Amino acid sequence: MLYSLLYGYFNINLFQYLTFRAGLGFFIAFFLTLFLMPKFILWAKAKKANQPISSFVPSHQNKKDTPTMGGIVFVFATIVASVLCASLGNLYVLLGLIVLVGFSFVGFRDDYTKINQQSNAGMSAKMKFGMLFILSLIVSVLLSLKGLDTFLYAPFLKNPLFEMPTMLAVGFWVLVFLSTSNAVNLTDGLDGLASVPSIFTLLSLSIFVYVAGNAEFSKYLLYPKVIDVGELFVVSLALVGSLFGFLWYNCNPASVFMGDSGSLALGGFIAYNAIVSHNEILLVLMGSIFVIETLSVILQVGSYKTRKKRLFLMAPIHHHFEQKGWAENKVIVRFWIISMLSNLVALLSLKVR
């Protein structure tokens, strides 16, 4: 809106620069989240919209009165900042906002069910998976119709591994959406554990998106160019800004949880950025914490079903370390460090290829 008004009509050249608009979007989203979150917390407490805590985690029972669904606030702040600072005529921006809103809506349905039933189970896995699948399929098909190329790239290699047939690419993108959104959802079990790795991952992906959308940088760095995708940089930075605002209230001890309303939206948007910037494989490194958490659950379930034995004291793995006597803050900060280092290595692939 500001972009169209100040640059389109008044020709204020400052607004033609992605970096300026992305920075402005960051601060708008940050301060809007800071402003709205206390009001949301008061409202949620009045409505008793508290996070049901599993009986299997007795050390977390003191968190049972903490309100959830804080993700609604940072998703809303991101949308406002994006509408103000990004070009809404850009399809990559519109699809990114659809991903944020759509995945957040599925998460909201799940959170609402948990609160109503006072159960940690939420809506049925079949319903949740079905809604996420339909959303992922729609966005993947639209990306294909947009003309996003279907080459599969590996980190540190300048040439693609191969070109996927359209149907295979769409199926692969759906898998990336589903796996990433659920991985972030599984990680969201301790104060700040999902938000900070999401910030690191989004910052890395936003750099890749910016490079992919810039003809000079992509040519110099031998990176695949994606026409018009650079505008998504504005939305990504807005989401990072809103996450910093959310972290202000989510750091230990948390005053609010993001809930599935936030974690599914984050996972979906991270996946979207990885797909449009051709970083589906590199996402495994950038989202290392999400991968580790998900693998711990898969291994735990698989081991118990096949051998009737558990590999970990509890899954996801952050609870395993808690059971071993690690303080919650120690688990959180160490996971943050792993995430930060993983993303620094991932960024090296921009130059080393």
UniProtKB/Swiss-Prot annotation:
Membrane topology per record: Multi-pass membrane protein
EC number: 2.7.8.13
N-terminal signal peptide: none
UniProt keyword list: Cell cycle, Cell division, Cell inner membrane, Cell membrane, Cell shape, Cell wall biogenesis/degradation, Magnesium, Membrane, Metal-binding, Peptidoglycan synthesis, Transferase, Transmembrane, Transmembrane helix
Entry cofactors: Mg(2+)
Coiled-coil parts of chain: none
Record localization: Cell inner membrane
A family per Pfam: MraY_sig1
GO MF, any single term: UDP-N-acetylmuramoyl-L-alanyl-D-glutamyl-meso-2,6-diaminopimelyl-D-alanyl-D-alanine:undecaprenyl-phosphate transferase activity
Principal cellular location given in the protein's record: membrane
Catalytic activity annotation: UDP-N-acetyl-alpha-D-muramoyl-L-alanyl-gamma-D-glutamyl-meso-2,6-diaminopimeloyl-D-alanyl-D-alanine + di-trans,octa-cis-undecaprenyl phosphate = di-trans,octa-cis-undecaprenyl diphospho-N-acetyl-alpha-D-muramoyl-L-alanyl-D-glutamyl-meso-2,6-diaminopimeloyl-D-alanyl-D-alanine + UMP
GO biological process, one term: cell division
Pathway noted in the entry: Cell wall biogenesis; peptidoglycan biosynthesis
Membrane-traversing stretches: 24-44, 66-86, 88-108, 129-149, 160-180, 192-212, 229-249, 256-276, 281-301, 330-350
GO CC annotations on file: plasma membrane
NCBIfam families: mraY
Described purpose of this protein according to its UniProt entry: Catalyzes the initial step of the lipid cycle reactions in the biosynthesis of the cell wall peptidoglycan: transfers peptidoglycan precursor phospho-MurNAc-pentapeptide from UDP-MurNAc-pentapeptide onto the lipid carrier undecaprenyl phosphate, yielding undecaprenyl-pyrophosphoryl-MurNAc-pentapeptide, known as lipid I.
Family: Belongs to the glycosyltransferase 4 family. MraY subfamily.
Protein name as annotated: Phospho-N-acetylmuramoyl-pentapeptide-transferase
Native source organism of the sequence: Helicobacter pylori (strain ATCC 700392 / 26695) (Campylobacter pylori)
